[in-house]
Amino acid sequence: MLMKFDPSIFRAYDVRGIYGKTIDEEIMKKIGNAFGQLADTAEMPEASGCVVGWDVRGSSAPLAEAFVEGLTYSGHNALIIGQTPLAATVFAGWKRKFNSAYITASHLTKEWNGIKFFDENGVGFMQEENFKIRDIVGKNIYDKKSGGNTKNISNKDIITEYIEHVLSRVKPRNKLKIIIDCGNGAAGSLAPELFKKAGFEVDDIFTEPDGDFPNRLPDPAEDDLTELKKRVKNSYMGIAYDGDGDRLVAMDEKGRKLTPEQISYIILSELLKKEKGIVVANVECTKMIDDIAKKFSRKVERIPVGHTYMMQAVHEEKAAFGVERSGHYSIPLLVPFDDSIAISFYAACVLSKSSKRLSEIVDEMPAYPFIRLNFECDDREKFKIVERIKQKLKNEKSQNFKINDMDGVRADFENGWILIRASNTGPSIRLTIEAESEEKLGKLKKEFSEMLEEEIRKM
C-alpha cells in the first residue's frame, strides 16, 4: 500500500518525517523528482548536478537511493558520495558548483529521517523553495526524461579534500588536548582526523557510526554529555557534535558548556583582526556579540531566527562571520557555508595561541543577566498575540526603546532588551530578556510577562 503524502513533513528549512509512517522510499523518490523539476526553472540557480550524501541512520542509504532515482528520472545528474558529515557533502557541492542534497534528521531521534537542500554556494534552501518542492510532490507530477546519470565518488576522497582545504586556511600554534564526542553520528568520519592531522592531541569517543545512537542522543544536550564531562577535566576543552555534524557543543575543562555567543567571542577576537566585513547575528543573540564587534568597529546586522537566514545574509553582505543562537555559525574564510566542524577547529586554533585555560578565558568575557521564558497559548492565536504586543509597543507615547520587528518584536532599551516571538514548532510564545543588571532584568521580566499573560487571557 502506497504511503499517503503528508505535506507537513516539509518544514521551513528542511524535510522531516518518521520513517515508515510519514516518509519512505516512494515519497523520497517523488521529492527527488520534484527537486529536479524545480532545478529546470529559472527560480533555482543553475548547477551542473546534485551531490547526494547521507548520515548514519539505518534508513538514510535506502532513502538516498530513492531520491537519486527520482532525480535522475527528471533528467538531472547525481554525484553520490555516501555517508559523510553534512559539511563534507555541502563542501563537495560548493567545490564542483553543484547543488547538494543530504539525507538526515539532524539531531532528532533515530526513528526520524528527512532531507536538506543547498545551492551551489552552500546556502540552505529557504521556505519558499522547499514549499515549491512540496507543492510539486503534492500535485503528484512525476517527470520522466532521459539523460540523468549517476556517478559515485569516494567519501574518503572528499574528506581528504575537505581536510586539506581547511588546513590551508588555519593551523594551531600549540597542540592542545581536546576531547571529541561524535555521538556515533556522521562527524566521526571527519572531525577527529582533522584535529589529529593539525597536531592536536585528540581523545575521541563514540566515533563508530551507529544509527541507533547507543551512547547518547543525536542532540548533544548538556545533560546527555556525561562521558565528555568526565574526560574533559583532564584536557583543555571538549567538543560534541549532533547527528549530522552541523551543530556543536563546546565545553571548558570544568565541564561548563559554552554559549554560542562565548564561542563567537573567542572566534571574533582573532578573526576580526584580519577579515573585513560585518557580523551577522540573529535577534536572539546576546549583547556579547555587539561588545566584541564594537572592539573592532564592526557593525552587527540582526536577522530573523533560522540558520538559512544567517547563511543568506552572510553570503549577500559578504560578512566576516555569522552566528545563530541555536548553534549554527559561518566563517567564509574557511568555507562559505554553515559548518560546525570547521568552526570548532577554528576556535581551537585561536585558543591554541593563549597561555590561559579555557575556563579563565570564559570568565573574563563580558556577561549579562539573561533569561528565556515560554508561555503556552493557542497555536492558532500565537502570531496574533505577538502582533498585538508589537502594535502596543509602537503606540507607546513615552517610547524609550528602539523596536525591531523582523521576527516577532524586539525592544532595545538603554540597558537591556526583550524579544517576544511565537514558536515555529509548538503552541507557545517565547520571551527572551537580557539586561545589564539583575534589577533591570527583574523589572523587564515583570513588565513583559504581565503584558504577555494579559494578551493570552484575551484569546
Locate each region found by the language model.
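Proline/glycine-rich low-complexity loops and linkers
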Residues: K132-I163, S168, E253-V323, Y329-I331
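Glycine-rich phosphate-binding loop
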Residues: S100-W112, V232-D252, R256-K257, V300-R302, ...
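Gly/Ser/Thr-enriched, mixed-charge loops and adjacent short helices
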Residues: N113-K233
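An N-terminal, well-structured beta->alpha segment
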Residues: M1-E69, Y73-S74, N152-I178
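Phosphate-binding and adjacent anionic-ligand microenvironments
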Residues: E275-M459
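Gly/Ser/Thr-rich active-site loops/lids in small-molecule metabolic enzymes
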Residues: M126, D204-F206, R256-E275, S340-C349
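N-terminal small/polar loop signature for handling phosphorylated ligands or for N-terminal nucleophile
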Residues: Q37, G49-W112, E193-M251
